[in-house]
């Protein structure tokens, strides 16, 4: 029983390391080979699906969900901050036009708390 859970843990650990390595490689090569970076992202996502591991937050927002391009602000992505009603970050993929929105309300609340103190 314990051996099985240990093996699962080890497999997940290896999967996370591989995913991290692939995203790091994608980050390095995206400037001169966007297609290779896209392939690295696709491989990382396949590993993530097969091993049923959560993608680390730092990488989750760095690729386009539609075309799997590795996003670099100013190169193939546009990043804007919006404060209408609910503050959020808008990331636009310049390769396929896909728009992703991420709220940053938690950060705003922390900033207000610090101002009051």
From Swiss-Prot:
Q: Binding positions for Zn(2+)? A: 64, 67, 93, 96
One GO CC term of this entry? ribonuclease P complex
The UniProt record lists the EC number as 3.1.26.5
Under the heading InterPro entries, the entry gives: RNP4 (IPR016432), Rpr2/Snm1/Rpp21 (IPR007175)
The listed locations are: Cytoplasm
Task: Spell out the reaction equation it catalyses.
Answer: Endonucleolytic cleavage of RNA, removing 5'-extranucleotides from tRNA precursor
Report the cofactors: Zn(2+)
Citing just one GO molecular function, the answer is:
ribonuclease P activity
GO BP field: tRNA 5'-leader removal
Q: Which UniProt keywords apply?
A: Cytoplasm, Endonuclease, Hydrolase, Metal-binding, Nuclease, tRNA processing, Zinc
Q: What is its main location?
A: cytoplasm
Record keyword Nucleus present: no
Q: What does the cofactor field's note say?
A: Binds 1 zinc ion per subunit.
Q: Which family does it belong to?
A: Belongs to the eukaryotic/archaeal RNase P protein component 4 family.
Q: How does it assemble?
A: Consists of a catalytic RNA component and at least 4-5 protein subunits.
Functional summary from the UniProt entry: Part of ribonuclease P, a protein complex that generates mature tRNA molecules by cleaving their 5'-ends.
- Protein name per its UniProtKB record: Ribonuclease P protein component 4
What species does this protein belong to? Pyrococcus abyssi (strain GE5 / Orsay)
């Amino acid at each position: 029983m314990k051996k099985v859970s240990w093996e699962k843990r080890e497999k997940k650990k290896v999967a996370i390391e591989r995913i991290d390595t692939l995203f790091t490689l994608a980050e390095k090569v995206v400037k001169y080979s966007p297609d290779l970076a896209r392939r690295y992202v696709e491989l990382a996502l396949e590993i993530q699906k097969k091993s049923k591991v959560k993608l680390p937050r730092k990488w989750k927002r760095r690729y386009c969900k539609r075309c799997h391009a590795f996003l670099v602000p100013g190169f193939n992505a546009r990043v804007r901050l919006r404060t209408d009603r609910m503050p959020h970050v808008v990331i636009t993929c310049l390769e396929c036009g896909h728009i992703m929105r991420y709220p940053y309300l938690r950060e705003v609340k922390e900033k207000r708390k610090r101002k009051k103190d």
